[in-house]
Amino acid sequence: KVSMQFVIQTMEFLHKGGRCSGLTYLLGNKFSIHPIVRLENGKMSVHSLVRGKDLTKGLTKMVEEFKTQFSNDNVDFSFPIMIPHVTGDYGVNKIEHELKDLVGEKMLLPVEASGIICCHCGENTVGLGYMLKNNLLEK
């Protein structure tokens, strides 16, 4: 029942760690593609891809998905909404700005991402994590 996703600035660390092929890495950098990775059942998988020079479109997509869950009354507010990041101050500020009027500033908790996220995703990775009332996979 945890929704945790990250938008990744560069696929360099995914490539170095063997998580993506050389061709994927090359095309991703050439066309400024940023993967949005979702953690499901303890495994990282690509949820979607966004294009752009920075993380803005990816952050917007994650926030829109949160707002969809919020409008469906599927967010469990007995837990904080976490914003894990790896040196991603811009992304943290953007997510906080988008969500503070919706959920309140006290519910938002920026945290440093774990070592696994740091190693696989690299710098400027920003995530959004929250608890759901109903599991996404049950639908």
PLM feature spans:
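Mixed-charge interfacial surface used for oligomerization/domain docking
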Residues: 1-139
